[in-house]
């Protein structure tokens, strides 16, 4: 079936023109891509407008693109920026749609099986469906994705085959439309009209497409003919006018044509027979009973409904792939000439490499103990070498590219060191460790008096806590950025720092996202001469760069000797400073401070909720696990639920599934007790 592709050009909206190193970087990147170069690196310092450069390259080449970010927060920032640059084009967001995800797991030592438990974010699910739809329908598409893009997704061929094409004047009876909608996993709901549902009133069928958030389609039939197709707002009912044709996309990426499902069922039955034989031979009768019961239940569900819970575990059969072949992913939905941009590549590339192994070990346990068939091992993220094979022409973007990017790019490393604002990299000073705490106290006071902010990085949690208490006792408004804080709270703390709610932020790893804050004029690195991951050349350059958005930016490294990493970081920072000063001198540029507005919290994946912004916060932003008494008031109940949920998410994240499950059960009990007590 031919699929209609919309070929609208990219139209870049910006009040700025490329300046500094940007014009040259745009030119070289675009030229290399046109010449077919597979790998190149944009070495762009903090605040040099790397995103703007990439946006210009995409607009210049007029090719679809995928931007990979290392986490949801950075992906959300990139998405917001790209949406502002390309308001007339399809800018999409593709990250994991789980707010909370505990995969099914088995712990042999305690004979504990933990069912899969997940909370799916409806808004992000809609955005994922919208992203694949745009890749299939439009050339002017930019998808901003997290590493979720390398995880298995439904097969694009099956997905395309299942689409329902509607056209004014087409002959089709109402029953046929309803059957097709059920096959697409839409449910009928005449009361609550929401995403992925349809309602029927006489000869009118209203469908709320799964990938849409503000448009629904109305089919008006006359006998067995589609008399009119129109779009309307599902909330207000306001009409947007008639359309000649409309395509309804499936509600999930895992829909499969009926004949393919029947074919898959036969293969699953055959594998089940082999597995049963194996378990009986090994005298593992419990495992044999377990796999038989679970698989037969799934087969029955697939036969009756066309899907089952955990259908992705049978994706090898549903997509018709052979054992060990890579699963279909977002890369299979991309046009063949798309670009791949890997942001913060020094973090993202190693992340891609690490996803496969963790997933594999958990699934092998499930297979060994009869919870899953061996074919479930093919529902997995891509291996690194598979990712390399599938990746189109790639631009790596980082202020400190890793060894992989440097090796792949060879000589094609494009420097973007000069900032359009003329801002220089921070000055670096080295001071002795013996005076670090008192010296920091006096520096923090000076900055607070000038309404500027300070970031402090320590090596240990204990040191960070003690330093926070010490500064607090001496009248400094300080907060400690805990590693246990969830992303939303983290964004709020950073927002409060920018608004001047406090002046000093202490943390261990300040390389994480969202810390490019124009108000920060001082970065203090304690114990800078202790070699290790947090004091490596790359980490030091990144941390020093946190003060690069301020006119008076300065970095103080407290050290008694200059390590190899320090020397390299200082040399690189000074190289950049010299290049920036020379450019400013030649072009008569006076450095300008950044006046970046403090925006509202980005509500992607938060359901637009800023509810915790006004709550009083303790000095420490996360608390250790404690035992809980039965709450007496509604407020106490809410606080306790929140604490327990935070712990549960943390345990699930650390793969401590037993502990997460125990807290989940505690939550259920707590809710029941509260309801009983009225």
Curated annotation (Swiss-Prot):
GO-annotated cellular components: cytoplasm; excinuclease repair complex
Positions contributing to ATP binding: 44-51
Main location: cytoplasm
Molecular function per GO: ATP binding; ATP hydrolysis activity; DNA binding; excinuclease ABC activity
CDD domains noted in UniProt: DEXHc_UvrB, SF2_C_UvrB
Entry's Gene Ontology BP terms: nucleotide-excision repair; SOS response
Functional description taken from the UniProt entry: The UvrABC repair system catalyzes the recognition and processing of DNA lesions. A damage recognition complex composed of 2 UvrA and 2 UvrB subunits scans DNA for abnormalities. Upon binding of the UvrA(2)B(2) complex to a putative damaged site, the DNA wraps around one UvrB monomer. DNA wrap is dependent on ATP binding by UvrB and probably causes local melting of the DNA helix, facilitating insertion of UvrB beta-hairpin between the DNA strands. Then UvrB probes one DNA strand for the presence of a lesion.
Family: Belongs to the UvrB family.
Subunit comment: Forms a heterotetramer with UvrA during the search for lesions. Interacts with UvrC in an incision complex.
Domain notes: The beta-hairpin motif is involved in DNA binding.
HAMAP family: UvrB
Protein name: UvrABC system protein B
Gene that specifies this protein: uvrB
